């Protein structure tokens, strides 16, 4: 987190202080004013987002009080911009208000953050965010008629509540994404409430909004995790690969200039500074649009849009066509006699340019794969440049790159083959076993979620023409969720090694993980007790949840048995459990003497 600059801009209104460089060109002035207007119009939403993300436990009523305080603050500063409090940056102002609200820090356990100042306080609030939101109640759902009545009665309060519920469940989603979600939901509510079949309309409109939020927040969390754990060089490498693939005709100097704005964007957005995040993302899009002729032919229509649609449009625009004169080979980095001298003169720039050059020539590859190839190239030159004839050594670099890609491609092909052969349910059990073996310390809900995400990635990608890049990119996001944002997150030694050793090779590392041998196995009685507790409880729970929970317990109990043995035990136990759950006295069914589960328990003990 030390890598984040943690700088901010003066707050919402704004009287312009020395900390904010004023634009001078007419087009820059227009852009600045448009961004400022957008921020001013969304003060309430931005306060809700920041407050709900920093203190997820806060009630809606408490957040509403903060919004009132913030709006009063805005009015005071508009009346007299010379007040000392009006020069605060966004995060400091919001965190001051959170800390000043009577009893709130003690009630929600963040008073330790309020005792700190400056960088340390911002860091503390950031680490107060919880990715696992299982402690929150289920997302509130209303009957469509009730929903429309609430929207009609007080649309502002209704939409604020929606923004609050979404933000607290997505603490690492960037403010522009959440504002887009709110705009889409408002549009959906307006349209659906005019229809006869409200439930159907809401269902149809909600699915793409949820998917949009999930996709972007997952990517943003993963990239911020890379910044926090591996530092700005890794963040820069990710962005070089992403932008070089999307805009293959961009020049290296133009890309370098653009990435300065992109890095500033991630500094603010990853920290959770809502105003800085909006300003810096707007600046990135303005930068791209001001040079669109030399960057991309696909974004002209996007650049004619206003905030926040412009950013969304550019992000979702198709990749530009690769220049016709651009071959697949990178002769500058494999055929030149001066490679070692150029590497030694300025290593960071040299490898950044290699990644740029290789990425724009191989737009079909995933971002993690491009980073792997760059690491392979670095290691190769480390060896070759110490030899008498370096050229004869690194001349075969392309072969090394192809070997790396072939290994990654084989992994994806195997996963897609499993998807086609097993189907979704069996494949989810496969990944559930795999994740539980590797990380049995994780709660069942998290293991199930990870396995679902992997299946969803394969279901999305395995029929596409860019199957490889799609699977590899999405699978890496799943591993990003497993590894988490906090660099101090610990699961077990082998998982921690994969999460921390090398960002690019995280996926191959996980692919070769064995069962965790440090985990203390539960007893046989614990397994049977877990099964009894599930099937004997009076509440009717989804059978799939019970099966998943039992499978997790089975893997933790007997990680070393074969897949065939595990499937046999899983089938017998769950069949017996379902049968026991349907009789009048299910507890008796689980006794050691019971013919339904007793034999299976003995079989399991033998397997162990």
Curated annotation (Swiss-Prot):
UniProt source species: Rattus norvegicus
UniProt KW Repeat keyword: yes
Every Albumin domain range: 22-210, 211-403, 404-599
Domain commentary: The second albumin domain forms a deep binding pocket that contains palmitoleic acid (in vitro). Palmitoleic acid is most likely not the physiological ligand. Instead, this pocket may accomodate the covalently bound lipid moiety of Wnt family members.
Cell compartment(s), UniProt: Secreted
Oligomer and partners: Forms a 1:1 complex with Wnt family members; interacts with WNT1, WNT2B, WNT3, WNT3A, WNT5A, WNT7A, WNT7B, WNT8, WNT9A, WNT9B, WNT10A and WNT10B.
Gene Ontology MF: a single term: vitamin E binding
Modifications made to the protein after synthesis: N-glycosylated; more than 90% of the glycans are sialylated.
Region (Binding pocket for hydrophobic ligands): 215-319
Keyword field: Disulfide bond, Glycoprotein, Protein transport, Repeat, Secreted, Signal, Transport
PANTHER family, alphabetized: AFAMIN, SERUM ALBUMIN-RELATED
Region (Disordered): 585-608
Carbohydrate attachment residues: 33, 109, 153, 402, 488
Family: Belongs to the ALB/AFP/VDB family.
Main location: secreted
GO terms for biological process, alphabetical: protein stabilization; protein transport within extracellular region; vitamin transport
Disulfide bonds: 77-86, 99-114, 113-124, 148-193, 224-270, 269-277, 289-303, 302-313, 340-385, 384-393, 416-462, 461-470, 483-499, 498-509, 580-589
CDD domains: ALBUMIN
Residues spanning the signal sequence: 1-21
Descriptive protein name: Afamin
Cross-referenced InterPro entries: ALB/AFP/VDB, Serum_albumin-like, Serum_albumin/AFP/Afamin, Serum_albumin_CS, Serum_albumin_N
Function, in words: Functions as a carrier for hydrophobic molecules in body fluids. Essential for the solubility and activity of lipidated Wnt family members, including WNT1, WNT2B, WNT3, WNT3A, WNT5A, WNT7A, WNT7B, WNT8, WNT9A, WNT9B, WNT10A and WNT10B. Binds vitamin E. May transport vitamin E in body fluids under conditions where the lipoprotein system is not sufficient. May be involved in the transport of vitamin E across the blood-brain barrier.
GO CC annotations on file: cytoplasm; extracellular space
